[in-house]
Amino acid sequence: MTDQSDTTLPEGVERRAFDGRQRLATRGESVYGEPTDGDWRCWDAGRSKLAAMIESGLEVGLAGGETVLYLGAASGTTVSHVADFSGPTYAVEFAPRPVRDLVGVAEDRRNLFPLLKDARKPDTYAHVVEADVDAIV
């Protein structure tokens, strides 16, 4: 594991001061009432396993700008941050209720594409996703 100060963050992710401490942030519209600083919004490592991994210095396979297939998007909190610093982001979720929230999150993100599909059955959504996905989360 790498010390936080040595961590190379994906392009489009920065450390910014929120509530008196340095935390991860992405540029984008607020989704869940998270603290903001101008265009930047806090990415809470206590609410997002992916943010916790990045915060801990683990390699997550995201550099910024890539095409992402995000499996298990739920209501869209973490995937909204991913879409803020990535290219096309396909968010797969099988439960209709969270997908309603996910669709609302996608309204402010032109590169976020919610898919009401079962992630275990890629043949049902492969025709929608770009052929060359750079990362699967």
List each language-model region with its residue ranges.
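N-terminal auxiliary segments of SAM/dcSAM-dependent transferases
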Residues: 1-40
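Conserved alpha-helix/loop element of class I SAM-dependent methyltransferases that forms part
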Residues: 8-15, 44-67
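Signal for well-folded cores of large energy- and translation-related assemblies
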Residues: 55-59, 83, 103, 107
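Conserved class I S-adenosyl-L-methionine
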Residues: 62-76, 88-90
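Conserved S-adenosyl-L-methionine
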Residues: 82-90, 110
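S-adenosyl-L-methionine
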Residues: 92-137
